[in-house]
Amino acid sequence: MKPYPKGDDKGWPGWQFPATDQEYPGANPDPLFHAKYLHELYFKADPEYKGRYSVPVLWDTQTDTIVNNESAELLRDLQTGFNSILPESDAGITLYPEQLREKIDEVSDWMQRDLNTGVYKAGFARTQEDYDSNVPVVFAALNKLEKMIHANGGPYVLGKDLTELDVRAYATVVRFDTVYVQHFKCNLGTIRHDYPQINNWLKNLYWNVEGFKETTDFRHIKENYTKSHGDINPLAITPMGPWPAVEEGWQPQVEKIRVGGVMMPKVLELEAELGP
């Protein structure tokens, strides 16, 4: 999909497919139906559809319909949904290992609510009061994540095992300094300056773990926000920085890195409410 334009303030006509591979690098035409708009697929699946035309979308070519469009569910379902056609070695790979499921579920709850969704609550606030109440929540979650990575010894959120939590956190953290600090005004701190543990974790995923860098396109990320939200950025000017988008220099020994955080009293109060 092209990151912009997405249409009017009600989302019509919504996400567009490029006509060719060259129209917008990194965005591909619809290979199944050659649709121009994503909404065409929603109406193909259900002619009476009344909801939003959102991504991601998982289309089943056997039943010829959308089977899921919820990212959290897809993150879980794709781990096992195709095991029957995968080699045994690949079918055994999981980001939701049984021994860590209770902890993953516990962390996922506040991470989704306060961090993944939290940046949008802050960024789309319509009043100063709403903005002021939502921004500290985001940084309380980042403070907690910072300490968790350090306490578990890295290189991942829960220690030596790559889990769903790393995927969930990455999607927000990799965008944070690039988009959320300026576009959503989440500017109490930055990942690279205020969260050295998270920054080190990000460096490892982006530069060392296959699949993360390859699926991250900073032009798409920036233009998806800066050229789509006319009420926030009416001139649609896209900032150049930060540079580099993700720093290099991963330190495998997390104990050698200081534990950072935003020390604003309201942030610390909300962090404490998240528990130990």
Report each predicted region and the residues it spans.
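C-terminal alpha-helical interaction module
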Residues: 1-276
